[in-house]
Amino acid sequence: MGKLELNKKRKKSALYNTAFELFTTKGLAKTTISDIVENAGVAKGTFYLYFKDKYDIRNKLISHKAGELFSEAHVALEASHITGFTAQLHFIVDNILDRLETESSLLGFISKNLSWGVFKDAFQEQADDDDFPFFQEYLNLLDQSDVQYDSPELLLFTIIE
């Protein structure tokens, strides 16, 4: 990865981290794009290279944070060698709940902002190319299962809710 790509990644990461901090302390309504870029140390134009508005960064941030949760749970699942969809799903849910128990701000952010519309957009698309493709991994676990589900998206949303 070249210097330019690293710089872009650093700026986007700063925007994500700052937006998360501001959204969890001030709330979405009281946070402005100017607040985000000022605290992230980037120009306003940089924000608009990556996001349409603060609602767009919120939605992508949900996907990004959920991707981190699922990625860590997936790594732990791989190391555990647990088989069977139900057992694997229980393991992943327990792993995520353990993490959310220690990170109440993340739990609050996701629970406040997760709706069916945001869920469908956020969980079916990766926020970034290097984000963990958790929705696809979830579908892969389902494919390996003997049971067929009519609405795997709804099943996942229900579990998360």
Task: List where the protein language model places each region.
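Alpha-helical DNA-contacting segments of helix-turn-helix folds
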Residues: 51, 58-65, 72, 110
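Short hydrophobic/aromatic patch on the recognition helix
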Residues: 41-51
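Hydrophobic alpha-helical connector segments
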Residues: 60, 75-102
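Basic, helix-initiating cap at the start of DNA-binding domains
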Residues: 1-26, 30-39, 56
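Amphipathic alpha-helical packing segments from all-alpha helical-bundle domains
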Residues: 99, 118-146, 153-157
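Short helix-capping/turn signature of helix-turn-helix
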Residues: 51, 112-118, 157, 161
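Solvent-exposed, amphipathic alpha-helical segments
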Residues: 14, 18-25, 68, 72-76, ...
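Amphipathic alpha-helical segments used for helix-helix packing
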Residues: 98-122
